[in-house]
Amino acid sequence: MGQSLFNLLYYVIMQNTILIFGYGYTGSYVAKLLSQKGWKFIGTSSSSSLTTETIIIIPYDREAITNVIKLATHILISIPPDENGDIVVGNFVDLLFLAKNLKWIGYLSSTAVYGNHDGALVSEESALRPSNERAKQRIRAEAQWLEFGKQHKISVNIFRLAGIYGPKRNALEQLRNGKAKSIFKAGHVFSRIHVEDIARVIVAAIKLGSVREIYNLADDKPCPTFEVNNLAAELLGVIPPPIVHIKDAELSEMATEFYNDNKRISNYKIKDKLHIALKYPTFREGLKAIYDWNYGDSI
């Protein structure tokens, strides 16, 4: 682990400590916000170089997790499920009983669980119509965590994320790397959300501490991908990628599945229950901010 268990205990004792299964892009933004409030972090990752003053990285294995699980007051799961559902439940559910101070569990799911609603507005109460196996796996994982929370009287929050974008993962990068595709399908839209707003919602949910909640995380403007690409091209001062009709597009299996589903994700609940005012209410504010931070002085 890079340091003794004694030092690890000293590091986290008497503090709110969140164990992030699958510490990566989204988890790093959650850590940034909570570290400002004095929280400590333990994350699983294959890259020990991610260890900093505020987060200790451990491998995703039984011995390492056994050593730290009892220190966790909160757990966030950011690992995709497999055919059996959530892999943390599958591999380590017995270890969760060692976490005597555990108050809250958050699971990062996906709006893919809703499947196709023919462009209709979808809330947390809408029917789940999974159209592919990955979405079905997400539903199984959600159910496993909600049942665990119910049985053991622990707060469990499910976060159904729309398409994630932010620094290093956005249409500007895709254009610069020649990977942007503008596909047209009549009436089809995607919902998305900036990673900073995801972190802000998660922190607000932790603060509220509701026993059993499901939240949609999306911004205010579902739209076709080509609208996002057009703005990115405008900011970069380049020609936008040509718009290709869906019937003429060469798409991967995963991309085809995305275009088979059409829905507009409602974010009313995070505004009403968590009092969230999105920092980036649409892709326009988000992309412009990313451009100003990362590209404005170099192009």
Predicted regions and their residues:
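NAD(P)-cofactor binding segment of oxidoreductase domains
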Residues: 70-108
